[in-house]
């Protein structure tokens, strides 16, 4: 019985790390490679996945943090570091900018702006803090980044050479191909995604 309690205790203490790893895997390995059949819908499908998954991951992290604070455990919260503060300041700036526009659908959803609205920013910020709170090994994060970057780059090189193993560029006009980066999507989405995930580095 004592051994079972010890195992459960260890699992409970590792829950934040597990939740953090799930979020990191989604954001760093799944999102860049995820796309659907409609090429011009690539940003929309990525945004939809982020907005669907992030609230659940945030809830999982909240439950994990509560479960990890077992009786007798005195786990001290780490002081925020520069990227944490910068991300919070950026999020505050986004909220203030949207508030000045009355939180209209154009700024929250941004359906006419490649769906890069406030809701996406909130989800990406939440993902950053979920990963930060889990305190997972930085080497693991770097490995996830490099793995996905290598796959995206490899696909991009193949596409540029006229090889399209995923049928990614079918029916796309030649002049439009240069605005997309492999499976990462349109340059606008790539810039936003890179900015928000840069803090993880």
Language model features: what each stretch is:
Residues 1-14:
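Short, Lys/Arg-rich, polar N-terminal cytosolic tail immediately upstream
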Residues 31-56, 76-81, 93-123, 133-136, ...:
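Interfacial transmembrane-helix termini
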Residues 120-127, 146-153, 194-198:
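Membrane-embedded alpha-helical core segments of multi-pass
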Residues 12, 16-19, 64:
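Generic L/I/V-rich hydrophobic alpha-helical segments across diverse proteins
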Residues 86, 185-200:
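Alpha-helical transmembrane segments at the extracellular/periplasmic loop-to-helix junctions
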Residues 16-24, 80-93, 129-157:
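Interfacial loop-to-transmembrane-helix boundary motif in multi-pass membrane proteins
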Residues 27, 31-32, 51-71, 94, ...:
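Central hydrophobic cores of alpha-helical transmembrane segments in multi-pass inner-membrane proteins
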